Curated annotation (Swiss-Prot):
Induction data: Expression is negaticely regulated by the global nitrogen regulator areA.
A Pfam family of this chain: Fungal_trans
Keywords: DNA-binding, Metal-binding, Nucleus, Transcription, Transcription regulation, Zinc
Polar residues composition bias: residue spans: 218-240
Disruption of the gene: reported phenotype: Does not affect the expression of expression of DMATS1, FFUJ_09176,and FFUJ_09178; nor the metabolite production.
Compartmental location: Nucleus
Protein name: Transcription factor FFUJ_09177
Amino acid sequence: MTRRSRRVAYVAKACVSCARSKQRCDGHSPCGRCSLKNLDCVYRHLLQKGQNSTRGASPQSPSASRESYSQNTLPVVQSQTRPLALDSAPSVYSPASEAIGEPPSLSTDVGNNFVEMSMDSGQETFPDGVSVNNLTFKIGESDLQGWASLGVDIPWNSSMHSMLDNPLFELPDPMAFFFQSPSELLGQSDVQAIPCPMDSEPMVHQLECETPTPNFTHSLDISSYQGQSNQTSPETTSHSSVRDDAELESWRAEDYGHVPDINDEAYQVMVFTFEQLNSDNVYCIPFTDKHLPSLQHMQIYMQVYFEEYHPIFPLLHKATFSPNKDDWLLSLAVSSIGCLFSKTLRSKEVFPIMQEFLRRAIRIQTSTPSISVAQASVLNQIGMMYGGDLRFAECAHETMAQLTTQCRKIASSSHNLANSSIAENTVSQGWQAWVRAQLEIRLFYCAWLVDSQQVGFFAFSSTIPIDFLQFPMPINEYVWGMSTAETWQNSLAEDSSSQQLTSLRQVLMGLYRYREVPGQLDAFNSLLLVMGILNDLSGLRHAHLYLEILQRRVETLPPTALTRAVMTNIHMVSLLIYFPTREVIAFGRWRVTEAQHSIVTEKLKRWMSDTRSARAALVHACSIWSQVRLSRTNSHHEPPALLYSAISIWALVEHSEEVVENADELPILRLDSLNQDVKLWAAGNEKKRLYLSGVGLLAHRGALARLISETARLLEQRIAWPQAWRTGPHLKQSYAESRRVQ
């Protein structure tokens, strides 16, 4: 029986509500969907026989508490035939399923960009396959190695060729290097006029003359949504508290007291939603056989987040952060990141479970988007992209559009953005109103920052254009860190550096035209400028000069973890100017043919004939490698930065054409730090013996083997992000393959 004939027969037996919505119906009276959504369940053939419509709850349905959450906990899934069933073993990663058959036509509206992917519709369902949204996925033994299934709400039906297309020689997707087994591709891959400005970029005039880009604050037609229920479930799951003495001591050591603890009411909402989304019903399938971590553990993870991760990613306002029932989703997101850095037993094992729970919980939100939900989406985006599981990474690329939509809706209905500048009228509004406005601004800039890093580090297509950010850049860290309204007001009155910056595009235009940055620029805003330069990289002629200006500015800032992270990003973008992401990965022999590798190698050799460019790239690569090795920051960008720097050093050393006679008589130049001697060597022609701490002399016969071994050790043992754990073995395998071929 064909799929079309089955579908006709199936819909004919559906109730009126399911048939009208084209949803799955189990045929019961009432059906499971109508029971869970508290809808009238009517069958036409029963009415024709004179029977009355049925309304009510299923005998198996819970009481009023479950009904109160039904609108928020049940996702809408269309055109599904049956759930995608994967194993729920405790392993963190597994290969992605391969699409077979011919997928249907897809149209996606991302921000202001309408993308259409035309594909034919498949006609068969294979015996060992599953069908989701008219797409058939083949499930083999290797596909059943994962820690949990991702459920039917994963957007498997969208190919990734928009970010993998390469007109030269179809290099592989760089993101594939960071995961256990990459999936096969489905296809191919207002600046004021100031007299006498300096010689500027051609794109400055182009940007000034372009039609203005619509921004986040343009009004949108926002439909009214039903608010979340205030009821909590009386049903709770018993979770044992921490009993092991060693684990108890770890808990006490990590009780930093940065923010208030999660209250029991908020935790019960988490437990109830977890049970709903981890149940076996017509809307989702279980993804784990584990329990949600105990309340005590969730509190640990939240404190660790503000100790380890908040200083390098200041999305939240620590002084006013309140983990209450209304913002339980944000509390869950914070804990899901904090568990990576906790020293308590088995804390890293719960990371994939919490990320999948968070992903599902965000997806079913139907109320008007709030700041806390969007903030949770940003953290979930980071957790999935750098979580080491290819399926999560594919979801992260798809759900970036959902985050963009959340930001647009929040901005369009906001009354705070127009009053977000630091002025007397803002002070008179009060601290809470100012914090609210700044939280919105930081949300939008952090979402754009995450998107830009994915573009640079994984060659993704951009989802949030930089010109959407037409509001002031975030306030500096000093004012943002104020813990009371009194100290906040004093800082505004006394500190001139607390004045608000203009928009990111305006600051970039000033940098391009006059080669200067505002004097009040702090570390976080410097990072935004670095990513802005990366965004404009293809149209800039002097990108390295602008990065050097930012580097000199960052060197004057206090030596914090965020400052070190900004320096690493500066060197990373500088390296990508010379050695693009795709070519770095292709040189590492990851999923390329010998012909493709030869093309990359020959191109590299021709480029290295320019000694100064080759030396500059080597200096930046060594700076990245040394900074991550000696002063880790726990930032999510460190796994790709360490990997790219190691492969770049490998390539530049192996194919260097600098012939040195009597090398033992030459002075040694250490590339661990970017001092004046290193800069002079990079800009000149003087010969040196190059030394890198942890590797030794780079010209030594075994230097590259030591480089790869040390890099793999750092990735597997020293970096907290799961992506790094997956990358180390790949790097060793690639180097071994290279030695074998040679």
